[in-house]
């Protein structure tokens, strides 16, 4: 009887001890697993929605831009701070994508080559979409802008249309659609009385040529020509209204399909929430809005 009782007590204690050890081990396992199943803390950053976009893996969008084309992109006088419509729009897109935006000042005439060499992820530099450019790179349309003719105040040559430039000296930035326009004009309507087309690396140099009398007109995007006139203290004016309006496009390499999709989504978001219209208004470019 005593031996049986001792055995019974031993078995009972063994069962209790086994249960205690099982509970203890279970607690340890639960404590180790807790961090993987815990709900995220309010306000904690979430996984980036563009994590599968190769160009954005480092958390930045690298933008190539010729930052000498006010009010689209320019440096604040005496600083290295880039400003302008394209700058603000790129920043708004970056905010939607959850990435920082970094700008690289790049000469316009070589900017497509720089993109193809992967010096940046995209071009945002008042680039008009053309069939020729579209053969090299892809675009996302984001504004609609035409061309303007900038002349000396009072319009001493009486220029009213492109054809009135025949036989005159005209300054223009190299690599722009305006240079193409002038070359086409020389091959067509001005073939018998060709213009002397003087090209410059940047638009401000073309404008200075007009100011010192080396040219009678400058062709540039209409908002840029208008800004040049407004900043000239009455020395310059724009002839009439813009003509040949066409889309500006964000330029991308053709293989950047994921980035293009992400940017298209971000652009739609800033249109939907009013940011797009606000940025246009900030720079007096309401007429450039895409429908």
Residue ranges with predicted function:
Residues 64, 100-107, 172, 193-202:
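Short beta-strand-to-loop elements that line the ligand-binding cleft
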Residues 87-96, 155, 163, 168-169, ...:
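Extended ligand-binding regions for polar small-molecule ligands
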Residues 24-35:
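Bacterial lipoprotein signal-peptidase II cleavage site
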Residues 47-51, 56-126, 273:
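Extracytoplasmic small-molecule ligand-binding "clamshell" domains
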Residues 100-164:
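Acidic, polar ligand-binding/catalytic clefts
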């Amino acid at each position: 009887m005593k031996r049986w009782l001792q055995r019974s007590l031993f078995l009972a204690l063994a069962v209790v001890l086994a249960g205690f050890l099982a509970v203890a081990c279970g607690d340890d396992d639960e404590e180790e697993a807790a961090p993987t199943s815990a709900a995220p803390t309010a306000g904690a950053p979430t996984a980036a929605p563009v994590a599968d976009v190769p160009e954005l893996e480092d958390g930045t969008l690298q933008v190539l831009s010729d930052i000498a084309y006010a009010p689209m992109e320019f440096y604040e006088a005496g600083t290295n701070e880039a400003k302008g419509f394209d700058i603000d729009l790129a920043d708004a897109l970056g905010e939607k994508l959850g990435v920082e935006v970094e700008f690289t000042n790049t000469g316009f005439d070589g900017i497509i080559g720089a993109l193809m060499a992967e010096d940046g992820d995209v071009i945002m530099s008042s680039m008009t979409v053309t069939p020729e450019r579209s053969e090299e790179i892809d675009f996302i349309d984001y504004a609609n802008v035409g061309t303007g003719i900038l002349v000396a105040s009072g319009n001493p040559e009486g220029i009213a249309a492109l054809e009135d430039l025949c036989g005159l000296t005209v300054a223009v930035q190299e690599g722009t659609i305006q240079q193409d326009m002038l070359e086409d004009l020389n091959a067509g309507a001005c073939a018998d009385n060709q213009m002397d087309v003087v090209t410059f690396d940047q638009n401000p140099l073309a404008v200075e040529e007009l100011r010192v009398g080396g040219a009678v007109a400058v062709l540039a995007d209409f908002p840029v020509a208008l800004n040049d006139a407004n900043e000239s203290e009455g020395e310059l004016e724009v002839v009439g209204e813009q003509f040949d309006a066409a889309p500006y496009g964000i330029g991308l390499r053709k293989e950047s399909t994921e980035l293009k999709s992400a940017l298209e989504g971000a652009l739609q978001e800033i249109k939907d929430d009013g940011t797009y219209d606000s940025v246009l208004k900030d720079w007096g470019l309401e007429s450039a809005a895409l429908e």
